[in-house]
UniProtKB/Swiss-Prot annotation:
UniProt-recorded name of the protein: Na(+)/H(+) antiporter NhaA
Keywords tagged on the record: Antiport, Cell inner membrane, Cell membrane, Ion transport, Membrane, Sodium, Sodium transport, Transmembrane, Transmembrane helix, Transport
Gene: nhaA
Transmembrane segments: 199-219, 240-260, 279-299, 319-339, 348-368, 371-391, 407-427, 497-517, 521-541, 565-585, 596-616
Organism, as annotated: Nitrosospira multiformis (strain ATCC 25196 / NCIMB 11849 / C 71)
Subcellular location: Cell inner membrane
Family membership noted in the UniProt record: Belongs to the NhaA Na(+)/H(+) (TC 2.A.33) antiporter family.
Purpose of the protein: Na(+)/H(+) antiporter that extrudes sodium in exchange for external protons.
Annotated disulfide bonds: none
GO BP: regulation of pH
An MF annotation (GO) of this entry: sodium:proton antiporter activity
Record flagged with keyword Metal-binding: no
Pfam families: Na_H_antiport_1 (PF06965), Thioredoxin_4 (PF13462)
Length: 624
């Protein structure tokens, strides 16, 4: 597969001299189908394609490529049969004959079609060579299908982009005509599926925040985040600044996604097996402990927290949690942009380590960066968590009860003095999982429902499926994935493309002034050094120790140098570091200095990490 192409694009461009095409080469619409002759959906789609060709005429070019059903000998024989008669100009005759069979394709059908088309005597010289050429052509189409992300047959590509919508003529026509809704949806999907997209969104939001903060609009921009919003009821009011609503409210979605990802990794993911989990766990622990210790060594206590303090418990002492964090989105985005220069196994390792890192950051925030505890509200939060546990234990799979209780939980957690975003983690623990369904049984059930509906004739054509049928199909759809998996699938892109960019926009703005430096130089140097040096040092030290002691094994797919490069990328603290800094430094000047240090340390870590990984691969290619 071409690594430069998005995963939902045609890997192999259409070639009229090679491909089987119907329609002019300069047609504005090219519809490519990967299909199988032994597949009822492909035969049904053949009729839809005929309607589309009739509707669009010379505006459309149709291309057929083989993707025989896996494990079906008759499907493979049919595809090779068609290809073996390609040179005699009978491809489309055979194609239409095979696609027009209404019953399940059999060997007798092939004999009948050959007889009907009078192909018995059409035996080219060198039968073995013809058969081999046909096999090679089918194999080439299968390879192209796999590289283009084809999973089912038929799969359509419209002007090079995979079409994932319904197979009815109206839906296909709208996609082919490029309606505004379809174009916007397709562009959004392309961007979202591009691996570096989340990092780019964060980078743009950060750059915008910094530019606006240092422009003539800076005072208004910063004042906007301090606008107070809330609910007033009679003489009572609950108000927070817009920035606090984002940091304490909107960011709950991010922590909910993190919690669901942690849950997945420890149940069916890379952390489910001890042997594969130990290396990233060791790396994450080292990558948290060493930067924190380095910060405490390098950074002085700073000014006292309050008048009358003896200075030993200074304001800067609480910032040791800042360099512990890793921004997974940025780190993975950089690895993805380097393509094949970075082994897939290293990306898996860094992702797993970042998950463990998130657990550590959550624990640190809960214990060290929460306010004064209010026992009554904390007890209420525990009671709500108990209700969530009862729902989980009782097999309640609807999302709405969990969402409602999750909102109530957030209120009590916020009021208790514990950081409110931890409500997202607690909620994630109780969102239920389920064993995988019996797909064959669900498919038969859905087929039975739809077959019964089609017997209603004109009524179903005018009004669609009946309400009982829709409810039954909804139940089948709900069973396809667990509530936890469904919630993660829906919330993860919203967290990446909405929550985190908004958080960066609200928190990354810093006015760069010479006054920020001055007495804050030790704080800034210590924070940046802990990120740039502490992270890779902790990664390497902990992983080498774990491997030497026999607790973990390092895959051969990547070298120690590449692991060090991943450790350097883990020094990109950014969003989580900004979040912890916002809790650790209540003073505006301290927070501004910490933000500059986080930016500088993260940028330097990114440059060092990319350089190490780039040169490590070049060195391996030079000395295989």
């Amino acid at each position: 597969m071409n690594p430069e192409l998005p995963p939902n694009h045609l890997d192999k461009p259409v070639d009229d001299a090679y491909d089987h095409t119907l329609g002019p080469a300069d047609a504005e619409i090219t519809l490519v189908e990967y299909g199988s002759y032994a597949d009822a959906p492909s035969r049904s789609a053949h009729e839809r394609v005929a309607e589309l060709r009739s509707r669009f005429g010379n505006r459309m070019r149709y291309v057929f490529r083989h993707r025989p059903l896996a494990g079906s000998k008759i499907a493979r024989r049919a595809a090779e049969l068609v290809e073996s008669h390609n040179n005699s100009g009978r491809f489309w005759d055979l194609h239409v004959a095979l696609m027009s069979r209404s019953d399940k394709l059999s060997a007798d059908d092939l004999c009948t079609i050959i007889s009907d088309l009078k192909l018995e005597g059409n035996k080219e010289a060198g039968q073995e060579e013809t058969a081999e050429r046909a096999r090679d052509r089918v194999e080439a189409d299968i390879a192209s299908a796999n590289a283009s992300g084809v999973i089912v047959t038929p799969t359509f590509f419209i002007n090079g982009r995979r079409y994932d919508g319904p197979w009815d003529v109206r839906s296909l026509s709208e996609a082919m005509l490029g309606s505004l809704g379809h174009v916007v949806h397709a562009a959004a999907l392309d961007f979202a599926k591009w691996a570096p997209s989340t990092g780019i969104m964060l980078l743009l939001a950060t750059a915008l925040a910094v530019v606006l903060s240092n422009s003539a609009l800076g005072p208004d921009f910063n004042e906007m985040w301090e606008q107070r919003l809330g609910i007033t009821f009679q003489h009572s009011a609950f108000e927070l600044s817009l920035r606090h609503w984002i940091n304490d409210g909107l960011l709950v979605i991010f922590f909910l996604v993190v919690g669901l990802e942690i849950k997945r990794e420890f149940t069916v993911g890379h952390l489910a097996e001890r042997q594969s989990a130990m290396l990233p766990i060791a790396a994450a622990i080292g990558g948290m402990a060493v930067p924190a210790l380095l910060y405490l060594i390098l950074v002085p206590p700073g000014p006292p927290m309050a008048p009358g303090s003896d200075g030993t418990d200074g304001a800067w002492s609480y910032g040791w949690g800042v360099p512990m964090a890793t921004d997974t989105a940025f780190a993975i985005a950089l690895i993805a942009m380097m393509g094949k220069r970075v082994p897939v196994e290293l990306r898996v390792f860094l992702t797993a380590a970042a998950i463990v890192d998130d657990i550590g950051a959550i624990i640190v925030v809960a214990i060290f960066y929460s306010g004064e505890l209010h026992i009554a509200y904390l007890g209420s939060a525990v009671a709500i968590a108990g209700l969530l546990a009862l729902l989980n234990k009782g097999g309640v799979y609807r999302a709405s009860p969990y969402v409602i209780l999750g909102i109530v939980l957030w209120v009590f957690v916020y009021a208790s003095g514990i950081h409110a975003t931890l409500a997202g983690i607690i909620l994630a623990l109780f969102i239920p999982t389920r064993p995988p369904p019996n797909l064959r049984a669900l498919m038969l059930q859905a087929d039975a429902i739809l077959t019964a509906e089609t017997r209603r004739g004109r009524e179903v054509m005018h009004y669609g499926p009946s309400e009982p049928a829709l409810e039954a199909l909804d139940a089948i759809h709900d069973r396809l994935e667990s509530p936890a998996a469904r919630m993660l699938r829906h919330l993860a892109p919203r967290s990446s493309f909405l929550v985190l960019p908004v958080f960066a926009l609200a928190n990354a703005g810093v006015v760069v002034e010479t006054s920020v430096f001055g007495e804050h130089i030790p704080l800034m140097l210590g924070t940046a050094t802990a990120l740039v040096i502490g992270k890779p040092l902790g990664f390497i030290t902990a992983t080498v120790t774990a491997v030497r002691l026999g607790f973990a094994t390092k895959p051969d797919a990547y070298s120690w140098r590449q692991l060090g490069g991943a450790g350097a990328l883990a020094g990109i603290g950014f969003t989580m570091s900004l979040f912890i800094a916002s809790q650790a430094f209540p003073e505006v000047s301290d927070y501004a200095a910490a933000k500059i240090a986080i930016f500088g340390g993260s940028i330097l870590s990114a440059i060092i990490g990319v350089a190490i990984l780039w040169n490590a691969q070049a060195e391996e290619e030079k000395n295989p």
